[in-house]
Amino acid sequence: MDIKINDFTLGNNSPFVLFGGINVLESLDSTLQTCAHYVEVTRKLGIPYIFKASFDKANRSSIHSYRGVGLEEGLKIFEKVKAEFGIPVITDVHEPHQCQPVAEVCDVIQLPAFLARQTDLVVAMAKTGNVVNIKKPQFLSPSQMKNIVEKFHEAGNGKLILCERGSSFGYDNLVVDMLGFGVMKQTCGNLPVIFDVTHSLQTRDAGSAASGGRRAQALDLALAGMATRLAGLFLESHPDPKLAKCDGPSALPLHLLEDFLIRIKALDDLIKSQPILTIE
């Protein structure tokens, strides 16, 4: 099943779409500068692009951690991004009352992994009529995503994207099961599946309030996932990851974006140039 977002198609057999940007809005200037680089690179490489950022990181481990600019200021920044670059925008919501105002500005709204089973939030998101990106919870198997999809269908919205972001592997670690991408496609009606490589790289030191990360392995993991014929890649970058206010250890240094995407696009083009081979 393909989904139309602005002037491009998101589907598992179509050229991949990049959901890229920054983890959390830090300021208007930094947002526009980062987005400008994404736009320049993706247009040069011919990659369909959706800008991603959070206005509020509502699930930080510490109450003292930076959360973002908030809903009102965040929507103003998203409006400026759309006006300046003419691109679609995706952001996440955490409470039902946020859904409608966000949907009026953003083209795709995202259901956070930790909240994916919250029925009131699911229904509120569905009622907006917007495309919804569902993050697969770390504690849920790929096949159980079907239950969340059915909630959205019952609430009247079938414009859904499924997003892998790693599964809990013991304490303080995540792994990505490459077989899970196919399972989600098969059990959820071949909805578009994308891969959040950034958050799949997270680790955590025992007792730490901040997430660690393995960005040195970002390309390896991204290539492995994209080899399974995916609709898109979810990627966060930062001009200086050491200064990022959230998830810097997992963020791709912004100056490496073009070289990174050249390799991703080459693999995606190769995979999708071949007919699908079904093995029963």
Curated annotation (Swiss-Prot):
Its EC number is 2.5.1.55. GO terms for biological process: keto-3-deoxy-D-manno-octulosonic acid biosynthetic process. Pathway: Carbohydrate biosynthesis; 3-deoxy-D-manno-octulosonate biosynthesis; 3-deoxy-D-manno-octulosonate from D-ribulose 5-phosphate: step 2/3; Bacterial outer membrane biogenesis; lipopolysaccharide biosynthesis. It catalyses: D-arabinose 5-phosphate + phosphoenolpyruvate + H2O = 3-deoxy-alpha-D-manno-2-octulosonate-8-phosphate + phosphate. One of its GO terms (molecular function) is 3-deoxy-8-phosphooctulonate synthase activity. Keywords: Cytoplasm, Lipopolysaccharide biosynthesis, Transferase. The keyword rRNA-binding does not apply. It comes from the Bacteria. The keyword Plastid does not apply. Its main location: cytoplasm. It is found in: Cytoplasm. NCBIfam families: KDO8P_synth (TIGR01362), PRK05198.1 (NF003543), PRK12457.1 (NF009109). PANTHER family: PHOSPHO-2-DEHYDRO-3-DEOXYHEPTONATE ALDOLASE. Belongs to the KdsA family. This is 2-dehydro-3-deoxyphosphooctonate aldolase. It comes from Neisseria meningitidis serogroup C (strain 053442).
